[in-house]
Design a protein with these regions (language model features):
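S-adenosyl-L-methionine-dependent methyltransferase catalytic module, highlighting the catalytic core
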Residues: 2-6, 131-145, 149-251, 270
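Short beta-turn/strand-loop junction motif enriched in small, turn-promoting residues
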Residues: 13-16, 75, 216
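Conserved SAM-binding loop
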Residues: 58-171, 197-203, 227-232
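Aromatic-residue hotspot detector
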Residues: 17-20, 24, 118, 206-208, ...
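Generic detector of short, locally flexible boundary/turn motifs and exposed helical patches
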Residues: 31-33, 49-56, 68-69, 87-88, ...
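Membrane-proximal basic amphipathic "stem/tether" segments
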Residues: 1, 241-280
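N-terminal juxtadomain amphipathic helix
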Residues: 1-63
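A local structural micro-motif
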Residues: 16, 87, 210-211
Length: 280
């Protein structure tokens, strides 16, 4: 496959990205290890926040902006934590039952947050693993502020009219309808469904204004990404496009410190993966 070059819209690095053959999970930044999917989500959030071509680490601090993200991975979460009122949560039933860490653990099928609490909710490759996904979408709609947006990626085929249901969840126990499929969480997280276009209709019925974007932004080495946006309002407002002249951030002596922060955050992710795999 031909090399892919561009600028990372998360850390600002410019150059040739590696593993372009891995599609959604590849085209990785050599500086911060963001994938094409990470950059696609950051790109959409940047468009919603009117940040243009600025990489995430140059976005202004706004602690009045409250963001909820499930199973956050990649380099952007540590930057979001510095800039916004950011809830990066994991699904851990034992921790959720304790109720001691509401900013770190949550069940999207039964969120413990107040109504109209968040400006943005992000779930990247999460909802194919949520047992009762419609409950989750309704909960997110409830906790979004009016005009707030839900940004989601899932394995999605826009050509498919109907979602493929892999597991019957109508009873207390899962009943497999197809060969079990696992990925994420060290390869131990069950996939309940493979989404088709009826997902958009479901979100619309709940009340969202819905948009589906097939994203290809060569300037940021974003390739073949489907992003779904649900806004708690009358319409989805996107977007400004990519300026011809990209930002040229000055990394300077702060680069080692930034890389340390990214490493520190991702250690938390690795620990969670290990615990999840052990529990399974």
């Amino acid at each position: 496959m031909d090399p892919v070059s561009g600028q990372c819209n998360i850390c600002g690095w410019s150059g040739e990205f590696f593993k372009p053959e891995m599609d959604r999970e590849g085209t990785m930044c050599r500086n911060c290890s963001s994938t094409s999917r990470h950059r696609a989500v950051a790109y959409i959030i940047g468009q919603l926040l009117k940040q243009g071509s600025l990489p995430v680490f140059q976005w202004p601090v706004d602690k009045s902006l409250r963001i909820l993200e499930s199973s956050a991975r990649g380099p952007h979460p540590v930057m979001f934590a510095q800039k916004f009122d950011y809830f990066a949560v994991e699904y851990d039933p034992a921790k959720i039952a304790e109720g001691k860490h509401p900013r770190e653990y949550a069940d999207f099928q039964n969120l413990h947050y107040d109504d109209e609490m968040f400006d943005l909710v992000v779930a990247s490759d999460v909802f194919e693993h949520v047992r009762k996904d419609e409950d989750g979408y309704r909960q997110i709609y409830r906790v979004l502020k009016p005009g707030g947006s839900f940004i989601m990626t899932v394995p999605y085929d826009h050509r498919r009219l109907e979602t493929i249901i892999r597991v019957d969840t109508s009873g207390k126990e899962d009943v497999h309808l197809l060969e079990p499929e696992y990925h994420g969480g060290g390869g131990h997280t069950l996939t309940y469904r493979n989404y088709g276009r009826d997902l958009l209709a479901l979100l619309h019925r709940i009340g969202y204004a819905v948009g589906h974007i097939s994203l290809h932004v060569p300037a940021f080495a974003i390739t073949r990404q489907s992003v779904i946006i649900g806004t708690k309002g009358d319409f989805v407002e996107l977007f400004d496009g990519v300026p011809e002249k990209l930002s040229q951030p000055r990394l300077g002596f702060l680069l080692p410190y930034r890389l340390f922060l990214l490493f520190k955050f991702n250690i938390k992710g690795f620990v969670h993966y290990w615990k999840e795999a052990k529990r399974k």
